């Protein structure tokens, strides 16, 4: 069966969410997440359902329950709630957490915006990883640079991922200055709201 991205290309349909829209929105998400990390906090449950777009197109990170716990908890003892597909493998294995854990979730969220489906869960990937097949198909619709960013972020080995959000920020910035914000008014389905149905 053809992937959604390939079917869209064959039909001459635009990507599910434009690359420019993804870059603009997630550049701002990364700005916010970098600020969170500056305060020695981790989000730990980043996914499209926890990114809210205001009417002016500005994304807001929601659900900081797990992040608040890190103020008073040893990360090695912290077992936050997480969503399969968006959670890094170290969350499942209860290993050391860090900014690289949220980086995995960023990659998973961008992947969801590209394909309309969440990635394989980290547990499934360790048994039989199909993600590379999906990523190669997405290169037919999106730039190689953006797909490389997602691939890098979704590395199962935490040491092979970017260790901070800063490295991703340099790759995600739109190649041209935005001429207008991505707003719910201009795009009724909005950039991320349609994907909340996927993860609920």
Model-inferred region functions:
Residues 25-26:
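Activation segment signature within eukaryotic-like protein kinase domains
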Residues 29-41:
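Protein kinase catalytic-loop region centered on the HRD/HxD motif
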Residues 76-90:
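Conserved activation segment of eukaryotic-like protein kinases, specifically the C-terminal portion
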Residues 90-100:
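Conserved end of the kinase activation segment
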Residues 141-156:
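Conserved C-terminal C-lobe helix
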Residues 161:
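Conserved HRD-motif arginine in the catalytic loop of eukaryotic-like protein kinases
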């Amino acid at each position: 069966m053809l992937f959604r991205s390939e079917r869209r290309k064959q039909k001459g349909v635009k990507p599910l969410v434009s690359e420019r829209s993804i870059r603009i929105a997630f550049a701002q998400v990364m700005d916010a997440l970098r600020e969170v990390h500056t305060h020695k906090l981790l989000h730990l449950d980043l996914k499209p359902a926890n990114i809210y777009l205001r009417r002016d197109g500005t994304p807001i990170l929601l659900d900081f329950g797990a992040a608040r716990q890190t103020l008073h908890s040893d990360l090695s003892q912290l077992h936050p709630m997480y969503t399969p597909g968006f959670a890094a493998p170290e969350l499942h294995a209860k290993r050391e957490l860090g900014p690289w854990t949220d980086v995995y979730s960023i990659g998973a969220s961008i992947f969801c915006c590209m394909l309309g489906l969440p990635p394989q869960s980290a547990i499934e990937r360790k048994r039989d990883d199909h993600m590379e097949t999906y990523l190669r198909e997405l290169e037919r619709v999106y730039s190689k640079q953006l797909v490389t960013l997602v691939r890098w972020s979704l590395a199962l080995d935490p040491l092979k991922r970017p260790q901070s959000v800063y490295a991703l920020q340099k790759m995600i910035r739109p190649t041209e200055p935005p001429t207008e914000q991505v707003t719910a008014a201009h795009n009724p389905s909005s950039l991320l709201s349609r994907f909340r149905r996927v993860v609920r």
